[in-house]
Amino acid sequence: MAKKITGYIRLQIKAGEANPSPPVGPALGQHGVNIREFCESFNTATKNIEKGLPTPVIITVYADRTFSFITKTPPASILLKKFVLKGKSGSARPNTEKVGKATRQQLEEIAKMKTPDLTAADLEAAIRTIAGTARSMGIDVEGVE
């Protein structure tokens, strides 16, 4: 028989940097989850992701206070800031003020990383999705309609 689920916790934690301090500790403590055990397993699971990138995680908490979790890829806006804007933030007025240029190759690279979490049917649709996010951040997009 399957374990009874008592709740889900959605957090965004920096890859490889989970620790018991807020927001992780209080969120898990409310559900009676072993915080140290979660932090160790999360840091192990995210060792392939660049350290410090915010990584969404969905934690499933069971009635016997055990847990399982699924890590997602970092948000597209974070990846665009990292690869295209080199750490700068997006534009406050994206339609009038452009803060950078993204090539099709950069968008394709980000789309390949995000493919498991996107609902896009193929790579081309994923590229268009990432291009839309880039435009909304004030980034000029080249090579994508």
Swiss-Prot record:
GO MF annotation list: large ribosomal subunit rRNA binding; structural constituent of ribosome
UniProt keyword annotation of RNA-binding present: yes
Keywords: Methylation, Ribonucleoprotein, Ribosomal protein, RNA-binding, rRNA-binding
InterPro entries reported for this sequence: Ribosomal_uL11, Ribosomal_uL11_bac-typ, Ribosomal_uL11_C, Ribosomal_uL11_C_sf, Ribosomal_uL11_CS, Ribosomal_uL11_N, Ribosomal_uL11_N_sf
Domain of life: Bacteria
Entry PTM: One or more lysine residues are methylated.
GO biological process: translation
Gene Ontology CC: cytosolic large ribosomal subunit
Family, similarity comment: Belongs to the universal ribosomal protein uL11 family.
Official protein name in the record: Large ribosomal subunit protein uL11
Naturally occurring in which organism (per UniProt): Coxiella burnetii (strain Dugway 5J108-111)
